[in-house]
Every structure is written in structure tokens, then in C-alpha cells.
Amino acid sequence: MNPISIFSVVISVICAVQAEFKVYWEVPSFLCSKRFNINVTQVLTSHKILVNQGESFNGDKIVMFYENQLGKYPYIDSNKVEINGGILQVADLLKHLKVAKDNITNLVPNPNFNGVGVIDWESWLPTWDFNWDKMKVYRKKSIDLVKSKHPEWPSHRVENVAKEEWEKSAKEWMVKTLKLAQELRPNAVWCYYSFPDCYNYSRKDEPSPLACIRKVLVENDRISWLWKQSTAICPSIHIQESHITKYSMSQRVWWIDARLREAVRLSMYHRNIPIYPYINYILPGTNQIVPVMDFKRTLGQIASLGLEGAILWGSSYHLFSESQCKITFDYVKNVIAPTVATVVLNTNRCSQLICKGRGNCIWPAEPFSSWKYLLDPKMPVFKPMKIICKCKHYLGRYCEIPK
């Protein structure tokens, strides 16, 4: 058999193995198909990217519930109007769960749905201290509530009780909503969007300041109930325009690495549950596409940490015109599809060759550069001494020991 034939056989065998690295397309690209006959899905599916039937935003592969789509989510809007009670302590949780049950069964009609379910609640945070900027209103309203009941208490006691009541209520709301979703659609994995956060927005010319600070680690551990109840973790590593203009490439690598490693750390609270980071192809608040090398590197970083995949999110805002749809189509064809194909191929190759197909490869001594191995389209050589395996149902450096 000549070398070309051997290469073809190797490729076919590897591709026959079910990909351990899954990329979900969460973009309403049906708008391009219906309005302008620009079909992005054919390119995506031919490169094993998971797309909902009919190119819908919510469907058989992935669903996302925004704040107004799931139950009676309490929040305070931009005009200071209190919606559904405004703050958690006075909102009706039972009514919320009753409505949420109908929402879930309607949006996810298949009781055997086995995709990814995402809850996107962003108006407030369960950690009291992280409700800053616009979210400070929740702390103020919580303090006012305690003050109205106990006007004689000193301010420090009022704030301590307000914090305790807020965090207790947040836990109850988030856990019971997750449990409901898991009971109704038990074959799916469920997560809250953008949890955990790392709040690593400083700009320094070394890795450590871009890592999660100790305060964040401590507070993320305090909400261990969230990681224990979740069956997936879905942090956001969206590339921002400010990252491109203010950060060097090395700093962008460090920023993403810190956020991913915090997700990995917290996943251990619940038997190493799968991690699906949210990534983007359009810079938020702009019409600019993510630079090609940044997109490639981001996907490579996710895979090089042994994670299960990624969710590629996009808004209908960028699909209203024919020119916008053409930009999306070209980026999918020339950047997203070939990058995903290469990363999936190399992830599977390394898994089969080094981890016996029982886990994914990690390069612990090369935390900021190992992504390059998985972006190499020329069948890179994987050196076992540089690799440890993130194993599924096995133990040992190379997943050689059954649990």
C-alpha cells in the first residue's frame, strides 16, 4: 500500500471514531437561508458541527432560555421597574417554577432531548459582593427590605442579614430551577451561561495578574452548590474588541486560559462534568469579525485542556442584511469549518494514539502554547512524555487502568 493510501485509511479510521470534542452552532442562521438563500448549515454539518434542525436557535441539539423565556424571573429593569417582584427574597418561587415547567415542555417538546440546555440569567449574581455597577440596586433593595423590618438595627447588622437572605434566596432559585429542568429533560446536560466568571480584566505584561484572584476563587467555592447541581459548565470566553486593541496575543492567551482553568477546577465538585465554553465569531457591539488567528487559538486552547467542546454563539442582529449573511457564510467556510475539522481530527488522533480512546490529551508543561498541536493540519507527532490524559471512566496517566 502506498503512503497516500495509508494516509487515507488512517483518516477514515479516525473520522469513524465519535468525536470527543463537540462544537455547537447557536446562531439563528435560518434567517440567511429564508431571506437570502444563503445556507450556512450545509458547510457546518459537513464539518461535523452540531446544528439544530431547521437552523433554529433552539432545537434538538441545544436550547437557551433567556430571562423572559423561563418562569417568572425577578429582576429590576433599566428604568428601575421591579419585574416579578424585583428581588429574590419577595418573588414568588412556586409561581416561577410552575410557569417554568410549561416553558421547558413547550420549548423542548421531546422528553428524550439529550443535548445541551442553557439558562441565561444575567441581571443579578448569586454572590452578594459581585453585584456591582448596575447590579448594586439589588444590594440596595435587599438592605431596604431588612431595614423596613428592623429599623432599630445598626447598619452593619442590616447589611449582613441582607447579604445572607440574598444569597440564600439565590441558591434556592437557581438550584430549584436547575432541578426542574433536569427532572423534565433528564437526558440533557444543564448549565447556567457565563458561570463561573473570573473577573480577570486587568492588563499586565505577565500571566499572574490575568489569572483569577484569590477573592474570586474563594467566592466561587462558596457557591459550590451551583457546580454540584449543574450537569455542565458553560463559561464565557467571548473575545471583546478591547482585547484586540489593548491586549497582546500573549495576554489574550492568558486571559482565556485563566477562565478555562477556573471552570476545570470547579467541575471537580461534580465528577468532572463537561465544560462547553461560549465563544464568538463577531466582536460584541461591533460588526467586526473575530480575527482569524484569535478564533483558531481560542478553539485550540479549549481542546488542549481536554474539554468536551464549545458553543459558538451569534445574534440575529448580525444576520439582518444579505451582506451580513455573506460575511457569516464566508467566515464559516474559510475559518470556522476548517478550524473545527482540524481540531476535532487532532483531538481524536491524540485520544486514540495516547489515551487509548478513553480520554483527551493535555500538555501540563506547555499551558500557553499546547493549543498549537491541535491546530496543525499536517498530522503532528504527539509525544507521550509531554502528555497526560483527562480520562473518562479510567485512571492512570494514559487511561490504562479501569475504575
From Swiss-Prot:
Cysteine pairings via disulfide bonds: C32-C325, C191-C234, C198-C212, C350-C361, C355-C389, C391-C399
Residues carrying sugar: N39, N103, N200
Active site: E122 (proton donor)
EC number: 3.2.1.35
Example of a GO cellular component annotation carried by this entry: extracellular region
Any Gene Ontology biological process: carbohydrate metabolic process
Residues making up the signal peptide according to the UniProt record: 1-19
Keywords of this entry: Disulfide bond, EGF-like domain, Glycoprotein, Glycosidase, Hydrolase, Secreted, Signal
GO molecular function terms attached to this record: hyalurononglucosaminidase activity
Tissues showing expression: Expressed by the venom gland.
Catalysed reaction, written as an equation: Random hydrolysis of (1->4)-linkages between N-acetyl-beta-D-glucosamine and D-glucuronate residues in hyaluronate
Domain EGF-like, first and last residues per copy: 346-400
Its job: Hydrolyzes high molecular weight hyaluronic acid to produce small oligosaccharides. Is an important component of the venom, since anti-hyaluronidase serum effectively neutralizes the lethal effet of the venom injected into mice. It may act by increasing the diffusion of other venom proteins by degrading the extracellular matrix.
UniProt similarity note: Belongs to the glycosyl hydrolase 56 family.
Alphabetized PANTHER family for the sequence: HYALURONIDASE
UniProt protein name: Hyaluronidase 2
Organism of derivation: Tityus serrulatus (Brazilian scorpion)
